[in-house]
């Protein structure tokens, strides 16, 4: 238990430090918290795509085959979480479509990089890194494109066109985005079986490493521009990410009879707090949601308790 607490302190304290730094910079006027377009372009078009490409391309095909059950469990758990949150956002809270989409992404796509990597590598070693890569793969190739299609479909330039044409155009536009093309290119590179040349790997890694810090700083910056809010929508988002998604994953571990570390990794990945993808996508499409940013912050805070509990549960799994 002391090991998990040490890993958590080393993982979550840096997350809150960078969030606080962004908040301070915006609140004190050091950085313009109303004009974040340049930071978002850096994230969405350069840093994040490089990180996603490497995260997928560095995985081996053999490992991908062994991780197939994990891929299935995470796809179902994350997909159901996204669907549930989207339904709540639209039908219960009556949130506009764009905000509903980015809010659902926040509540279903975990902070795999900033929290998942140190947590699972600290517990399971290199195998934990592969499990995290699977989580990123599911989010990047399933949840992100769905969200982008909704955002593109609701773009003001598309509003006057028939629904069918808007959907086709939105799908085409979303798959041209670097954040979707990059993991697809990484998957293609992986299947071809060519090792990434060292200079290319190091070059992409250099900019890719800035992703987490930039995303968390941007979130803090956006929080400084809007009041923090605790609403029914925020509570629902936290409930879905921190409790419902882990419960779904745990049920699927037993349904698919995942034994050993694979089942434990699937469960722990589902317990990770909300990630920054929703914030980044929202900033790109001018969707400024106080609730979305509040979910990210509170979900991370609550994970200080939920992750140790989940770890204790995981060690008793078959």
Language-model-detected regions and their locations in the chain:
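Alpha-helical transmembrane segments of multi-pass small-molecule/ion transporters
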Residues: 1-318
């Amino acid at each position: 238990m002391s090991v998990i607490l040490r890993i958590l302190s080393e993982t979550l304290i840096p997350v809150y430090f960078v969030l606080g730094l962004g908040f301070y910079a915006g609140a004190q006027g050091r950085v313009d918290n109303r004009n974040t377009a340049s930071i978002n372009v850096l994230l969405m078009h350069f840093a994040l795509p490089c990180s996603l490409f490497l995260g997928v391309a560095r995985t081996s095909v053999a490992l991908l085959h062994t991780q197939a059950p994990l891929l299935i469990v995470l796809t179902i758990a994350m997909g159901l979480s996204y669907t549930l949150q989207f339904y709540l956002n639209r039908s219960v809270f009556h949130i506009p479509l764009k905000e509903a989409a980015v809010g659902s992404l926040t509540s279903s796509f975990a902070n795999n990089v900033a929290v998942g990597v140190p947590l699972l590598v600290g517990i399971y070693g290199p195998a934990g890194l592969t499990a995290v890569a699977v989580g990123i793969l599911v989010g990047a190739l399933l949840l992100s494109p769905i969200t982008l299609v909704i955002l593109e479909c609701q773009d003001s330039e598309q509003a006057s066109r028939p629904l069918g044409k808007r959907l086709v155009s939105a799908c085409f536009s979303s798959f041209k985005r670097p954040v979707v093309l990059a993991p697809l290119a990484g998957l293609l590179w992986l299947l071809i079986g060519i090792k990434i040349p060292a200079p290319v790997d190091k070059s992409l890694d250099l900019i890719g490493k800035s992703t987490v810090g930039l995303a968390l700083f941007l979130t803090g910056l956006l929080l400084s521009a809007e009041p923090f809010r605790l609403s029914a929508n925020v509570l629902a988002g936290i409930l879905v990410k921190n409790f419902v998604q882990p419960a779904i994953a745990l049920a699927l571990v037993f349904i698919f009879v995942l034994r050993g570390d694979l089942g434990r990794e699937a469960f722990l990945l589902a317990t990770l707090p909300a990630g920054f993808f929703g914030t980044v996508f929202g900033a790109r499409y001018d969707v400024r949601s106080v609730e979305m940013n509040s979910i990210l912050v509170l979900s991370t805070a609550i994970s200080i308790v939920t992750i140790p509990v989940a770890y204790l549960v995981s060690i008793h799994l078959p």
